[in-house]
Design a protein with these regions (language model features):
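A general structural signal marking secondary-structure boundaries and capping sites
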Residues: 33-34, 61
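Conserved GNAT-fold acetyl-CoA-binding loop/helix
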Residues: 34-56
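Acyl-donor (CoA/ACP) binding surface of acyl/acetyltransferases
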Residues: 1-24, 30-32, 72-178
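A generic secondary-structure signal
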Residues: 56-57, 121
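Sparse recognition of residues in long alpha-helices and their boundaries
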Residues: 42-43, 66, 162
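A short helix-loop-beta-strand connector motif used in the catalytic cores of GNAT acetyltransferases and
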Residues: 57-70
Length: 178
């Protein structure tokens, strides 16, 4: 079992690196059709593909521009979600963040705390000037969560994402290190 990363512990959760023991859970989450709209997946992912993803996640964020973490509930060490930091560009000092919370653990503050910890890490350790998130228009829960964390809705890409016989607008939310 992986150990929490120093500085990645909140009141409800801690964040830790992905490990081989996470393969069944990540395979289940990545193949949940309810999550496909948010993450852009259009087909099931194999265990081999997820295995490669886990192996690649050990590389440094400066090398890959991304970092994937498991969200664990404090006390129980139960994995409740997956946090991804991506599109890290040191020259522009910005980073994107995305979160997936297991359906049994939503609306309990885990996603909000994970985004908060990731934002603090981006500002304090990576010296980012901004953190941003992409949210589809239908996802009002994520929009509210980001707004409550100080993110601002700064852009809309109309009819950006095709899903289930319709287009969805894509919203950009940004938070600056001020």
């Amino acid at each position: 079992m992986q150990t929490p990363i120093i500085g990645f512990t909140g009141q409800l959760i801690c964040l830790r690196a992905l490990g081989q023991e996470d393969l069944p859970l990540l395979h289940s989450w990545e193949n949940d059709p309810d999550g496909w709209l948010s993450n852009g997946t259009v087909n099931p992912l194999s265990k081999d593909f997820i295995q490669s993803y886990i192996s690649a996640s050990t590389r440094h964020i400066l090398e890959t521009g991304s970092m994937s973490l498991i969200i664990e509930k404090l006390g129980s060490k139960e994995a409740v979600g997956h946090l991804v930091l991506y599109d890290y560009t040191p020259i522009h000092r910005r980073l994107a963040v995305g979160v997936y919370i297991d359906s049994h653990h939503r609306m309990q503050g885990f996603g909000s705390e994970a985004i908060g910890l990731a934002t603090r890490y981006a500002f304090e350790k990576l010296r980012c000037d901004q953190v941003y998130a992409e949210v589809l228009a239908y996802n009002s829960h994520s929009q509210h969560m980001l707004s409550s964390l100080g993110f601002q809705h700064t852009a809309t890409l109309p009819r950006w994402h095709w899903w289930d016989s319709r287009y969805e607008d894509l919203y950009y939310y940004q938070k600056w290190n001020e």
